[in-house]
A protein has these predicted regions:
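N-terminal ligand-binding/catalytic initiation module
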Residues: 2-178, 414, 441, 445-459
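Solvent-exposed alpha-helices and their adjacent loops that cap or buttress functional pockets
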Residues: 70-75, 117-118, 143-145, 169-172, ...
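Glycine-rich phosphate/diphosphate-binding loop of Rossmann-like nucleotide-binding domains
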Residues: 89, 96-110, 120, 172, ...
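General beta-strand structural signal in soluble alpha/beta enzymes
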Residues: 126, 152-155, 178-181, 238, ...
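Terminal amphipathic helices with adjacent charged low-complexity linkers/tails
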Residues: 163-167, 172, 243, 404-440
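Adenosine-phosphate binding glycine-rich loop
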Residues: 181, 201-203, 312-427, 448-451
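Rossmann-like adenosine-cofactor binding region
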Residues: 260-334, 340-342
Length: 460
């Protein structure tokens, strides 16, 4: 039985992680470190191999064949986490974007690197760029690509996050996968949740009506995933802070160079030609995905009540969802998900990005396509189906460690099917490799804790 907390209790609970973070971050002075992968038995003899003069031989080999960097260096398991910190949680309120310091994003990027390592066995390096210019971010990423097997773009404000991702994905000179987790990762988890939620309510993709509340970095990239799954674009109504998107939205048309995806939605969705706001967008909808402003009361119970029977409602605002889950349920929603871990059905991108990158690195993929992300979503949904799907269990949690290798294998197979992999490995080989790599990362962390190399948490 779910324990329902009051608003005051939830707010107090929401403050505790920040209080603990201010106590623990200065104690550990960072969350990730670089550690040797090779033996060091004798400084003189071993460093003659690992450094000069011996290292000249693999350097020459890579010069002749750049793909050998995956064999002779850490490139094959290293990802860059690239940000300008303009969308970092805690910096968006009280600071003008131009005044945000890139270095202020380091604690968050280190936390991301920690998740990469522990859940995916991926070595991730935080890189906070001292520029907010999208073209310079693109250029810096291209300059850095020789050192990395992949790039995770993180916490870059819109609309430049769309521009940066699109330019890097379409650039023929970029030969490593580039992923924007705020866009693609969240869309992947939402899709996984909807796959199982629709099974519960017994509805088909090609029949449902969808309301997307918020037209930013979550819902705009989600729409192609929904269409690929069978949703009819005309059955989707998207609403931003100024109302429903439609062809007469001149404010969007005037900015279509920066918001190309949003303008396309204006032109191609909403076949009924609806006008109005959130209430009108949600009326009669089978599914509502809200990624807008924190609640409560950003979405009202009567708007949920006006949805179709057996409705599905995902409210993803932080720290408080647009409507409390129990209010959505009382108003008639059958399945409810939020971005919070203290409610059932947490929709969080941490469930997918470690496994997806594990898969693309293991086959040395050249890019991450929507089809690869959809394959990961389907595998996440399948994992939960095997464990049991019900109204409060539509996706796994990050504690379900064995879901990540399965995502990796599914993504690796899809990359090969699309001709985007440098290596050819079977599903069984990919699964085994991912399991071993992730287990090793977690065992190493436990060993460092057991031996005191990672200090125990200090007393309060």
């Amino acid at each position: 039985m779910t324990i329902v907390l009051t608003k005051e209790e939830l707010l107090a609970k929401a403050k505790k992680p920040a209080e603990d973070a201010m106590r623990l971050h200065p104690f550990y002075r960072g969350k990730v470190q670089v550690a040797p992968k090779c033996p060091i038995r004798n400084v003189v003899d071993d460093f003659a191999v690992w450094y000069t003069p011996g290292v000249a031989a693999p350097c020459r080999a890579i010069q002749e064949n750049p793909d050998l960097a995956y064999e002779y260096s850490s490139k094959s398991n290293t990802v860059a986490i690239i940000t300008d910190s303009t969308r970092v949680q805690g910096l968006q309120v009280g600071f003008a974007e131009r005044d945000i310091r890139a270095v202020a994003g380091l604690p968050l990027m280190e936390g991301k690197a920690l998740l990469f390592k522990y859940l995916g066995g991926v070595d991730a390096i935080p890189i906070c760029l001292g520029t907010q210019d999208p073209d310079e971010i693109v250029l810096a990423t291209k300059w850095l690509q020789p050192s990395f097997g992949g790039v995770n773009l993180e916490d870059i404000s819109q609309p430049k996050c769309f521009r940066v991702l699109d330019k890097l994905r379409s650039d023929p000179d970029v030969e490593i996968p580039v992923w924007h987790d705020d866009q693609q990762g969240t869309a992947t988890v939402i899709l996984a949740g909807l796959i199982n939620a629709l099974r519960i309510v017994g509805k088909r993709w090609d029949e449902i009506r969808v309301a997307l509340i918020g037209a930013g970095a979550v819902n705009v990239p989600l729409l192609p995933f929904l269409v690929a799954s069978g949703v009819k674009l005309g059955n989707v109504v998207v609403c931003d802070s100024k109302g429903i998107l439609h062809p007469e939205r001149k404010d969007v048309e005037q900015k279509k160079d920066d918001y190309a995806g949003k303008w396309q939605i204006c032109m191609e969705s909403n076949a009924e030609g609806r006008r109005g706001g959130i209430a009108e967008a949600m009326r009669g909808a089978d599914v509502c995905v809200a990624a807008s402003r924190p609640g409560p009361n950003a979405i009202l119970p009567e708007w949920v009540a006006a949805m179709a029977d057996e409705s599905i409602v995902f409210t993803l605002a932080n720290p408080i969802p647009e409507i409390w889950p129990w209010e959505a349920k009382e108003a008639g929603a059958r399945v409810v998900g939020t971005s919070r871990g203290d409610f059932p059905n947490q929709i969080n991108n941490s469930l997918v990005f470690p496994g997806i990158f594990r898969g693309v690195l293991d086959v040395r993929a050249k890019t991450i396509t929507d089809e690869m992300a959809i394959a990961a979503a389907e595998e996440v949904a399948c994992w939960q189906q095997e464990k049991g799907v019900d109204e409060e269990h539509i996706v796994p949690t990050i504690e379900d460690a064995d879901v990540f290798p399965r995502e990796a294998a599914a993504v690796g197979v899809k990359a090969q099917e699309q001709g985007l992999a440098r290596l050819s490995l079977s599903h069984a080989e990919l699964l085994s490799r991912a399991e071993q790599t992730i287990r090793q990362a977690q065992d190493m962390t436990q060993f460092l804790m057991d031996k005191g190399f990672i200090q125990p948490l200090p007393e309060k």
